[in-house]
Amino acid sequence: MRNKYIQAFEDAQIASKSVPDFRAGDTLRVAIRIHEGDKTRVQNFEGICIARRGSGVGETFIIRKIGANSVGVERIFPIYSDSIEEIVVLRKGRVRRAKLFYLRDLRGKAAKIRELRK
């Protein structure tokens, strides 16, 4: 059983942050606040969400994008991190899995995800 003070703090953290509804297969743009010396800037990371795991304050998601020279780049973000400015859902993907780790082995058009029709 959790300490009631810790539980109250976690509930406040979750309530203070508005997170859009997204799943694995969705294309996201995450705006991350980066501190460099005494300056702060916002950097966008855009890619496909390949997994969500955990629950509550400790919940994380993995985003994969194809960078320069066709090199795959993956980043793991805590959903309720203070360094995340915003999460924007660009496309809803149509997939039948919760974890899309098989995309790591695919290249080119094979790595495309169909868009969810409304």
UniProtKB/Swiss-Prot annotation:
Keywords: Ribonucleoprotein, Ribosomal protein. It holds the Pfam family Ribosomal_L19. GO terms for biological process: translation. GO terms for molecular function: structural constituent of ribosome. GO terms for cellular component: cytosolic large ribosomal subunit. This protein is located at the 30S-50S ribosomal subunit interface and may play a role in the structure and function of the aminoacyl-tRNA binding site. Belongs to the bacterial ribosomal protein bL19 family. This is Large ribosomal subunit protein bL19. The gene is rplS.
